[in-house]
């Protein structure tokens, strides 16, 4: 085999493998995000109706919930919230899309009866 051909073939193979590696690293670079919602329960009966609806909507949108309902919270600085909900998302964009979705908006009447949002925000992890 011609040495120039071997070098050219090796360069093409190297470039292809390098491009594949860069693509793989880029795919892994997507950072997870978490929404944190501090709430005050207004009506426990309404909350028992709302909870399965919002959990189904979150799951349908690809979110993963942590069972923090009724768990203890302690404050290291400032006041501890009364109740906190935490949801894991594949990306900050996915979290934002859910909060802006019809599935979330359509539950507002039930949510407003069940609980009051004190604060809701999303945070992106810096590594997976």
Where are these regions (language model features)?
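Short, exposed beta-strand-loop hairpins at the edges of beta-sheets
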Residues: 96-99, 109-115
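Basic side chains
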Residues: 4-6, 68, 83, 111, ...
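Short S/T/G/P-rich N-terminal loop/turn motif that feeds into the first structured element of a domain
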Residues: 14-100, 123-128
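Bacterial N-terminal signal peptides that target proteins for export
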Residues: 1-11
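C-terminal end-helix/capping segment
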Residues: 112-128
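A short, polar/proline- and glycine-enriched secondary-structure boundary/capping micro-motif
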Residues: 78, 108-109
């Amino acid at each position: 085999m011609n040495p120039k051909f071997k070098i050219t073939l090796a360069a093409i193979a190297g470039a292809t493998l390098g491009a594949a590696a860069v693509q793989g690293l880029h795919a892994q670079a997507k950072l997870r995000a978490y929404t944190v919602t501090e709430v005050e329960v207004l009506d426990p009966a309404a909350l028992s109706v709302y909870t399965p609806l919002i959990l189904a909507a979150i799951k349908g949108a690809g979110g993963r919930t942590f069972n923090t309902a009724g768990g203890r919270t302690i404050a290291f600085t400032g006041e501890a919230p009364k109740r906190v909900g935490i949801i894991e998302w594949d990306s900050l964009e996915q979290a934002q899309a859910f909060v802006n979705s019809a599935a979330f908006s359509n539950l507002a009447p039930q949510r407003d009866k069940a609980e009051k949002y004190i604060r809701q925000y999303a945070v992106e992890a810096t590594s997976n």
